[in-house]
Amino acid sequence: MRKLTVAILFALGLHGSAMAGLAEGANAYNARNYALALKEITPLAKAGNADAEHLLGLMYYMGRGVPRDYKQAFSWHYKAAVQGKADAQYVIGAMYYTGNAVPQDQKLAVQWFRKAAEQGHPDAQHALALMYRYHVAGMPQDLVIAYMLCNLAAANGHRNAIEQRASLVKQMTQEQIDEAQAMSRNWKPGTPLPTSSHTGGGGS
């Protein structure tokens, strides 16, 4: 079984309606003024703003403006994740997968990746695709679902998903490809992702 590697990739995705302090904090972060970012973001995170929680978690994860602290990073990302922040859900999934600051738990990783993927998060979709392709974390091997997920991530410009899809197609029948394409077309963000296909089980 090929080892699945998951890169922690963060996209802030801040909403235009975010309060001024959050926008100022994000701007300061992007300008690498981490002290100002911390000042603006921390009160909002403590007040329960999911975007601020995610950004503060990122600062702890990267050690920007604060000492690097993976437990704090997990804590803040978890607060955002349970509020439905897809970026944070992906991070929580990755931390469970790697056992970073928490006991390694691949089943929990799958749950959090799926939550993010069902919101259209391309990194989470790609991570799930690899799990379906390589039968990781107790996932059934299903090349059709893997291809579908790569399709969805590729539509958002995920380069690794594009490469993975090109590799997958070499293992698939035309019937499997057709099913995967149809599933991709019919799925809408915010709806459950399929957990199995008619033709995609097994494979090399």
PLM-predicted stretches and their roles:
Residues M1-L4:
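Positively charged n-region of N-terminal signal peptides that target proteins for export
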